[in-house]
């Protein structure tokens, strides 16, 4: 049986690249704020028994009627995750971006199983494009690369220790499993089985509608 997990749902981003008059995670999508699609899916996952929404207090009303905890958003992603960790009571935690509307229960269950083998795991997909490094220009082997998605599953104490180390060493993390990497803990990669999208630009909403 999989252990119970907490979910940190990150909703503190400003969404400057999107160009809307409000953060993109709160834009209407299929009749409700975008982030609620992820939240409603999370509620269907039996392993999740605690949800912490990290957001600006002015947006807490959007989650009225949901049994969630709130934590204030930080300046950086890792600051927001650290803020959410203060409310986590489970030994395992999932972290998910609020601008990713799709969470699939079967993938999350597999992710939790795999994470227990090493201490950390993330969803990934293959790179379908040719990727070139800049300065100097060099073609990279795309078979050795992966596109990283969320949610990511990490042992709570590992995530906390890694974030504290990053803070001491003044390292900016680009994803949450990097906290495990800093500690020398291997990260397991779990291939996603369903379409994933992160809403970054207006055209991404069109793609998300098509994926429903």
UniProtKB/Swiss-Prot annotation:
Q: What is the lineage of its organism?
A: Bacteria, Pseudomonadati, Chlamydiota, Chlamydiia, Chlamydiales
User: GO biological process annotations for this chain's record?
Assistant: isopentenyl diphosphate biosynthetic process, methylerythritol 4-phosphate pathway
Name the UniProt key words of this record, in alphabetical order.
Answer: Isoprene biosynthesis, Nucleotidyltransferase, Transferase
Function comment = Catalyzes the formation of 4-diphosphocytidyl-2-C-methyl-D-erythritol from CTP and 2-C-methyl-D-erythritol 4-phosphate (MEP).
Site keyed Transition state stabilizer: positions: 17, 24
> Encoded by which gene?
ispD
Top-level EC class, please? Answer: transferase
Annotated protein name in UniProt: 2-C-methyl-D-erythritol 4-phosphate cytidylyltransferase
Q: Which domain of life is it from?
A: Bacteria
A Pfam family that this protein carries is IspD
Keyword Nucleotidyltransferase annotated: yes
EC number assigned by the record: 2.7.7.60
Q: What pathway is it annotated to?
A: Isoprenoid biosynthesis; isopentenyl diphosphate biosynthesis via DXP pathway; isopentenyl diphosphate from 1-deoxy-D-xylulose 5-phosphate: step 2/6
Family, as annotated: Belongs to the IspD/TarI cytidylyltransferase family. IspD subfamily.
InterPro entries on file: IspD, IspD/TarI, IspD/TarI_cytidylyltransf_bact, ISPD_synthase_CS, Nucleotide-diphossugar_trans
* Site residues, Positions MEP for the nucleophilic attack: 142, 198
Q: Which reaction does it catalyse?
A: 2-C-methyl-D-erythritol 4-phosphate + CTP + H(+) = 4-CDP-2-C-methyl-D-erythritol + diphosphate
Q: Which GO terms describe its molecular function?
A: 2-C-methyl-D-erythritol 4-phosphate cytidylyltransferase activity
């Amino acid at each position: 049986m999989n252990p119970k997990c907490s979910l940190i749902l990150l909703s503190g981003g400003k969404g400057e690249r999107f160009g809307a008059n409000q953060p993109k995670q709160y834009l209407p999508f299929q009749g409700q704020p975008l982030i609620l699609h992820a939240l409603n899916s999370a509620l269907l996952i039996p392993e999740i028994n605690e949800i912490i929404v990290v957001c600006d207090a002015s947006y807490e009303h959007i989650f009225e009627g949901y049994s969630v905890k709130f934590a204030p958003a930080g300046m950086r992603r890792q600051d927001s995750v650290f803020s959410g960790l203060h409310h986590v009571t489970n030994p395992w935690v999932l972290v998910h971006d609020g601008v990713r509307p799709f969470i699939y229960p079967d993938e999350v269950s597999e992710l939790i199983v795999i994470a227990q083998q090493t201490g950390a795991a993330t969803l990934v997909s293959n790179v379908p494009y040719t990727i070139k490094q800049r300065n100097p220009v060099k073609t990279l082997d795309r078979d050795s690369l992966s596109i990283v998605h969320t949610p990511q599953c990490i042992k709570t104490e590992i995530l906390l220790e890694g974030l504290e180390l990053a803070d001491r060493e003044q390292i900016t993390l680009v994803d949450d499993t990097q906290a495990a990497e800093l500690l020398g803990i291997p990260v397991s990669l779990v291939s996603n089985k369903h379409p994933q999208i992160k809403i970054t630009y207006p055209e991404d909403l069109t793609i998300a509608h098509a994926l429903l």
